[in-house]
Structures are given as C-alpha cells and as structure tokens.
C-alpha cells in the first residue's frame, strides 16, 4: 500500500540555499504553507513568497545568536506527532502538523578545512537544531517527509503532482534513509575533527592524536553494485567519497561500454594516478595493477605507441590512461592494435568515441582535467583492523637529487632517471624500472628479491628487442646488496636512481663506480604493496 500523506505545511531551514527558492515557489504554488527560520526566511520573503517565521509560529524568539531557533515543542510536536494517534494532544497545545522538513546543516567540513580555522569557529558551526529536526522527521517518516538533498527537489515536486499533493510511504522512507545517512556523516566529521585534537586516552600517553583521530569514522556512498568482486565467488560494490573534487576513477564519467568490474576500477585507478605525474603528453598501460608500459611523447599517439612497445604481450586486455584528450587517431591505433578493457582520459573527441563504439567491450571514461593533487588518506584493510596513512604525494625534482658516484649523469640519463622514478612509484614492490628516451623498456614488479626484479626488467627489454645500453634504472627502495647493481650493469644500465639508506650504501656505490654507472639518491622511498 502506498500510504500517501498530503503535504500541506513545510518547514524550510537550509545552509546551502542552492535551489531552495525555486523549490519553495513550487511548494507554495501547490498550496503548501511555508515555515522558515533566519536567513532562509529572509531570502524567501525577499522573493515575495508568503512565509511564516518559526519564531512567530512558536511565539518564542530566536536567541543566543541563533543557537536556539527550532528547539521548541510546537516545532518538534508538529514533526513527531503521529497522525490519528496524537491529534488530540496536538490540538490541546495548538500544535500544527508539519508534513515536510527541508533542512541541510551548517557547513562544518568546509569550516574546519579553511586555513586558520579556530576551535571556536568549528564549535559555532556545529548544527544542533538542524540534526534534531532531521532525526525527528526521519523517525516519523510514516507521516513526514524529510528532505536533506537539493538534488531531490525536482523529483519531490513531480511526485506531489502525480499523487494529488501527496508523497508515498516508499518515497518518505527513502528520504528518511538519506536523512540518517546525512546526520551520521555530519556527526562523523565532528567526531573526527575533535578526536584529532585531544590527547590519546589509552595508557599513559600524553601525546596529541595529531593527524589521525582516536576514532575514525568513514562515510562512503554506494555508486554501483558489481557482478562479482576480485574473483567470481566474491560479492562486491563500489563506494565513493562524497564531495571529492580531484579527478579520479571515482568521479569519472563512463561515456561508453559495459559496466566496470571490480578489477577494472582498481586497475583504472592505478593507471590514472600514474599518468597524473606527467606534464608532457603521456600514456600509461596497466595490467593487474602494475604499469606494463609508460611513455611521454610529442602527442598521446606517440606516447601510446612507445608505451605499447614496452610489453605488447602484457598490454593485451589492459587499461590505458592518457593525460590529454583521446583523439580519433589514437583511438584508431588502440582498436587496430590490441584488445583493451578501459580507456580513461580527461576527455574524448566525438570522432574518437565513434571509433571505440565499434568495439562493444571497450569502456571509455572521461575524468576531466586535474590540477594539484589533494592530500588525503590511504587505507589498507587487514583482518580485524585498518591501516591508515597519508597519500603518497611525495616526489623529487632534479635539484633535490644527490649524485653519490664518481660519474655524473648525462642530461638524457637524468631525464630518464626522473621519468622512471615517477613510474617506479606506481609499481608493486620490489619495483625496478628501466627507461630510455622517456619510455619504459623493462619493468620488474612485485618480486620478493630486488635483484630478481632487476633481472626481470632486463629480460623483458631483451624479449622486446629494446636496447638497454645507456638506459636509466629506478628502484623504489634502497639496494640491500650490490647484486642489483651488477644485474643492471650486465643488462647495459648506465644510470641508477634510488632512495639510498642501506647499511651497505658504500658497497652499492662502489659497485656503481666499478661499472661506470652514475647513481642518484632521492632520500625518499616509494614502497607499494
């Protein structure tokens, strides 16, 4: 049964006023009486809408600089009153039923994100009356509609029109779920903020919690259910953070192809985050979360051609990311040359999409252009817990490198070293990357021994007929022994970039000097597990 409830009276009190005037106009035009508070009431009155201030309705003024506005029995009685059960007591106390509550909360997250935000500023942006009304209306969803998202305004008006001025129980229940999600996320933000400011409460520690709150509350919104997870016997879904601004796989728009799989999303994230490191036209090809070919070029077609040559076998069924618009010529080269699961780029031309559309299994995503990376947190689930760390946004420039060998790198070796250092950051540890002329020529990933990663990189280069002589090699972490340098020298590497920091650095540097290799220390590690 639909259990419709007519909407005759609505209380509107919003911080984010986007769309509220139009929504209020639509409600008023349908005979809905409007109650409102503070700035919302003033805005509606300025637009010529008939609106009753809550203070006039309750007979009690706003007080304490607006801290107390709606905390009154005539407001909450009107929201919580059960139709058909509490009518007599509502009439006795002159409480009018409120059929719809439209509320969004003080911008706490935006406030504390501002540079120089004080604790006092944060406290004043903790909404009290708003969440109370939201929870009251959500609790009484059998009779009251609670609206916390402006994106629902149009659909609500359409349903009111389709149901002779009423909303169905199904809609009210869905709105109530959104309301509880909204207040849960809001309280989580406050708890995280305050939790990061207090001393640790376990044991005798007096240290401040610092970057990480003592209780971590996370809020993610389900974007899609999936056919299965990493393997077919695992169920899965994709959740995204709310209000993410940075271009990412989470914010990307799929413009073509069938639904993304769990592994598609994970691999696309790896490819996109890697290609973001480059300012020049770049292409990254990823397979099983590891780059198998990366290059920069004069155009994305040139970059793709060079990236593909690194490892054509692994590129089959891979993910391809670009940092420029996907054009028709590049799209044609991809489709003609290989099977690809996903292509992601800031944008795609109409001509390119016509070409990729010929292959129904090709998924095309556009993510928009990106600017500066946004600091955030990375999570790794372990059984019974969660590891949390800052995103690895670290990178070094030429001026920060230390040459620790007798021989200085040539200009080309230095360029290649910086190039493959960027790539190594996105290769699973132990990671070794060989590069020459701004393209990868061999990648050794995920080996338990660093020397074997170095050997694999050399084998891959040899298999594809790519000349290693004169190339640069990047290692994501220090060399514990000289054997990795010996393997690189045997392959033809002439420049090495690595963090340094081993107790055997002297031995490793001596090996480089023996082979005439230039070695650069970054003093920064990029483990990736």
From Swiss-Prot:
Look up the EC number in the record and give it.
2.1.2.3, 3.5.4.10
**Highest taxon of the lineage:** Bacteria
Q: Top-down, what is the taxonomic lineage of the species of origin?
A: Bacteria, Pseudomonadati, Pseudomonadota, Gammaproteobacteria, Enterobacterales
Keyword Acetylation attributed: yes
What's this protein's family per the entry?
Belongs to the PurH family.
Any one GO biological process: 'de novo' IMP biosynthetic process
InterPro entries in the cross-refs: AICAR_Tfase_dup_dom_sf, Cytidine_deaminase-like, MGS-like_dom, MGS-like_dom_sf, PurH-like
Q: Which residues carry this modification: N6-acetyllysine?
A: 287
Task: Decide whether keyword Ion transport is in the record.
Answer: no
Q: What is known of its domains?
A: The IMP cyclohydrolase activity resides in the N-terminal region.
Q: Which reaction does it catalyse?
A: (6R)-10-formyltetrahydrofolate + 5-amino-1-(5-phospho-beta-D-ribosyl)imidazole-4-carboxamide = 5-formamido-1-(5-phospho-D-ribosyl)imidazole-4-carboxamide + (6S)-5,6,7,8-tetrahydrofolate; IMP + H2O = 5-formamido-1-(5-phospho-D-ribosyl)imidazole-4-carboxamide
The molecule here is called Bifunctional purine biosynthesis protein PurH
SMART domains this protein is in?
A: AICARFT_IMPCHas, MGS
Recorded hits in Gene3D superfamilies, A to Z, give: 3.40.140.20, Methylglyoxal synthase-like domain (3.40.50.1380)
**Which Pfam family is an annotated match for this chain, by its short name?**
MGS
The alphabetized UniProt keywords are: Acetylation, Hydrolase, Multifunctional enzyme, Purine biosynthesis, Transferase
This protein's GO cellular component annotations are: cytosol
List the molecular function annotations (GO) for this entry. IMP cyclohydrolase activity; phosphoribosylaminoimidazolecarboxamide formyltransferase activity
